Regions:
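Small-molecule-sensing regulatory modules
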Residues: 1-45, 52-54, 62, 137-312
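Short active-site oxyanion
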Residues: 2, 73, 119-123
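Short, structured active-site "lid" loops
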Residues: 46-76
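Ordered, amphipathic secondary-structure segments that act as subunit-interaction surfaces
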Residues: 71-84, 197, 203-208
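A conserved helix-loop-strand patch within extracytoplasmic ligand-binding domains
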Residues: 81-84, 88-142
């Protein structure tokens, strides 16, 4: 089957698209990649939150890609799942979710080995409200610095000394093999990842049964369960990719239960609400995600979300 993948043009996005293309190629499909420039890629001089305010849209990295799917220009899209809005438009399906890689956030620094080693008042670069909020909760003295751009751009700014450290997703650095300055991988109980972080989402049109069948082998059931929980919780809280909510679901080491970590934190005050919950393996993922959201709200998350477009 001839397949066309719609992808953003960043180094990481193309790595991900080529990875999926190679897996499809090994199944005998002919695959090409079409680069699509999204709203989030074009508006590089302002924050993600400001981009969302301008567009009135949570899908700042997906809208144009979905347009390519809708008009038949592409058969599938490869997304970083954390960038894909929870309210997927009606014509589209999340046809496959491959096995997740390291979902953790990491500290990257030239000179400092850990978050605790950063000096008083250190400058730390991040474009994420969620990371900024958790950073302020852990180290109120630190100055978060708005930091956009692709991985190479951020690493260059770090090397130039614009900041003392940056916060990134482990998955991107691992995939691009750019871990020279990776100093600390945060456990979810300390620094909770975004919903879907470390996972890819393969999006297709719902009515494209041939493409859905072609990508079905890529789907990983445990990963799909975990990210469904995370995305259900995020949807219940009214959060998009820039609301300061961290949610992570994983199988316990002995695979006997699901472990869930969640946090809602205020980007400026550092106030945070955290939960750690265990659930039976046979749980319903949607119901479990909704339960996590209810637990967060019951422990005081609503006021923290009120100013960020989340649940009231």
């Amino acid at each position: 089957m001839n397949l066309r993948i719609a992808s953003r043009g960043s180094q990481l996005a193309l790595w991900q698209a080529r990875h999926i293309a190679a897996l499809l190629g090994a199944q005998g499909h002919s695959v090409e990649i079409e680069i699509i420039k999204t709203t989030g890629d074009r508006l590089q001089e302002i924050t993600f939150a400001q981009v969302g305010q301008i567009t009135g849209d949570k899908g700042i990295f997906t809208k144009e890609i979905e347009e390519a799917l809708a008009d038949g220009h592409a058969h599938l899209a490869v997304h970083s799942l954390k960038d894909l809005p929870t309210d997927l438009p009606q014509p589209f399906a999340l046809a496959a979710i491959p096995p997740r890689v390291d979902a953790r956030d990491v500290l990257v620094s030239v000179n400092f080995e850990s978050l605790s080693a950063l000096p008083q008042g250190a400058r730390v670069g991040t474009s994420s409200q969620r990371r900024r909020a958790q950073l302020k909760a852990l180290r109120p003295d630190i100055e978060p610095v708005e930091f956009r751009g692709n991985v190479d751009t951020r690493l260059r700014k770090l090397a130039e000394g614009q900041v003392d450290a940056i916060l990134l997703a482990a998955a991107g650095l691992d995939r691009l093999e750019k871990t020279e300055w990776l100093r600390q991988r945060f456990e979810p109980i300390q620094f909770c990842p975004a919903a879907g972080q470390g996972a890819l989402g393969i999006e297709t049109r719902k009515d494209d049964s041939a493409t859905i069948a072609a990508v079905a082998f890529l789907d990983d059931a445990p990963t799909r369960f975990a990210v469904t929980v995370e995305r259900a919780a995020l949807a219940s809280l009214g959060g998009g990719c820039q609301v300061p909510i961290g949610i992570h679901c994983r199988l316990a080491a002995d695979e006997s239960v699901w472990e869930l970590f969640a946090v809602v934190a205020a980007p400026d005050s550092g106030k945070a609400v955290r939960i750690h919950h265990r659930a039976p393996v046979a749980s319903d993922p949607i119901a479990l995600g909704q339960l996590v959201a209810q637990m967060l709200l019951a422990t005081g998350a609503a006021p923290l979300l009120a100013g960020c477009g989340g649940a009231q």
